[in-house]
């Protein structure tokens, strides 16, 4: 078995992340100096839409917005939880051409691999995309996992598809 991770840039609604058992690691942004978590698994779809509207309304009003990077320590913590649960890890990142998240996850994976992964694997896939194009990869991985595929089988199948996906905004 393996656990699937995405960052909140995948824009997976909480109900979809829960349905497909996908772990979402949230960005934390600053809006006019106030920390705002980008993902909350407890929000209803209506609350998620309202939170998104508030974010873009703040942007339109000229509020100072700073995006954050998910720390290597956060990735280590989340990946370690999966390893401790006797599972492999598969992470789909926001494009490394947009964010440093892939590198943070890579450093975390290297740190964990240098110690003890209990024989489990950590696979990282740069989606080379953003938004739901990133999330769709995780949904496909979930379906493959449910069919009994290993982390390597799922990752090896999905990684070549990265270059064939386009995000439309």
PLM feature spans:
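N-terminal glycine-rich anion-binding loop in soluble enzyme alpha/beta folds
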Residues: 3-74
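A short helix-to-beta-strand connector/capping loop
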Residues: 19-21, 118-121
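Glycine-rich phosphate/diphosphate-binding loops that line cofactor/substrate pockets in enzymes
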Residues: 76-89
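Short glycine-rich or small-residue beta-strand-to-loop segments that form or flank ligand, phosphate
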Residues: 88-96, 123-126, 140
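Short Gly/Thr/Asp-enriched flexible loops that form oxyanion-binding sites at enzyme active sites
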Residues: 94-115, 136-138
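Short helix-capping segments at alpha-helix termini
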Residues: 111-120, 147
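Glycine-rich phosphate-binding/hydrolytic loop that grips phosphoryl groups
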Residues: 128-146
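Internal, active-site/partner-interface "lid" segment
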Residues: 142-169
């Amino acid at each position: 078995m393996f656990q699937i991770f995405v960052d909140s840039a995948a824009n997976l609604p909480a109900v979809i992340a829960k349905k497909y058992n996908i772990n979402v690691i949230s960005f934390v942004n600053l809006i006019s100096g106030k920390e705002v978590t980008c993902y909350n698994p407890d929000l209803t779809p209506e609350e998620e839409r309202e939170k998104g509207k508030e974010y873009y309304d703040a942007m339109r009003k000229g509020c100072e917005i700073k995006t954050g990077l998910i720390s290597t320590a956060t990735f280590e913590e989340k990946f370690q939880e999966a390893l401790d649960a006797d599972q492999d890890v598969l992470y789909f990142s926001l494009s490394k051409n947009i964010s440093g998240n892939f590198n943070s996850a890579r450093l975390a994976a290297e740190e964990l691999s240098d110690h003890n992964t209990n024989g489990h694997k950590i696979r990282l896939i740069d989606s080379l995309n953003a938004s739901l194009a990133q999330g769709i990869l995780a949904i496909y991985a979930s379906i493959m996992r449910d069919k009994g595929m290993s982390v390597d089988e799922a990752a090896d199948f999905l990684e070549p598809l990265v270059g064939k996906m386009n995000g439309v905004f």
